Amino acid sequence: MQKIQSNQIQEQDLTPELKKWLYASGSLTQQLTDLADGLFTVEPIQEKYQRMSFMDSRWMRMPAYHVAWVRESLLYGCEQQPWVKAKSIFPVLSLQKKARIFKHIGKKPIGRFLFQRTTPLCERRVIRLEEGWTRQSCYTWHGCKFIVQETFLASFEQYIQHHSHSI
């Protein structure tokens, strides 16, 4: 998987519409729900334990290659094609605390819990993956650190270009 760090991103490579989404704060769940007039679904693809990458471990200030529970899912708005591919990385240490609720949410979006009555601390970086522009957020929520990665797929870029909604 090829990554391009945000300091290497050329402004002309990024549409103004998508740039707003990549750098928006708050709940992507709520923003997508609003864009899709209330239609929003989560389709879990895979959930498993795996070792964190060196870069993710370092970003979260965790021991190198720490074990994490990883949840991958597709997020759908008002179209049949998925808009976002999401990947959440919860270190085992966070699962021993309040973040353990995220392991059992099934088809519910993480954002519904993450932003409920709280605004977690967030460090963000924007990268380009093969599948599309991606924002990675390292959250600190009730003393738990975890990463939420959201890749905006081509179908989403096409939708926002044709429907010029703003967030």
Curated annotation (Swiss-Prot):
Repeat keyword on record: no
GO BP field: pyruvate biosynthetic process; ubiquinone biosynthetic process
Gene Ontology molecular function terms on file: chorismate lyase activity
Residues binding substrate: 71, 110, 150
Swiss-Prot/TrEMBL catalytic activity: chorismate = 4-hydroxybenzoate + pyruvate
Keywords annotated in UniProt: Cytoplasm, Lyase, Pyruvate, Ubiquinone biosynthesis
InterPro entries (UniProt xref): Chorismate--pyruvate_lyase, Chorismate_lyase_/UTRA_dom_sf
Pathway: Cofactor biosynthesis; ubiquinone biosynthesis
EC code(s) of this entry: 4.1.3.40
GO cellular component: cytosol
UniProt subcellular location: Cytoplasm
Pfam families: Chor_lyase
Function of the molecule: Removes the pyruvyl group from chorismate, with concomitant aromatization of the ring, to provide 4-hydroxybenzoate (4HB) for the ubiquinone pathway.
Similarity comment: Belongs to the UbiC family.
HAMAP family to which the protein is assigned, alphabetical: UbiC (MF_01632)
Protein's UniProt name: Probable chorismate pyruvate-lyase
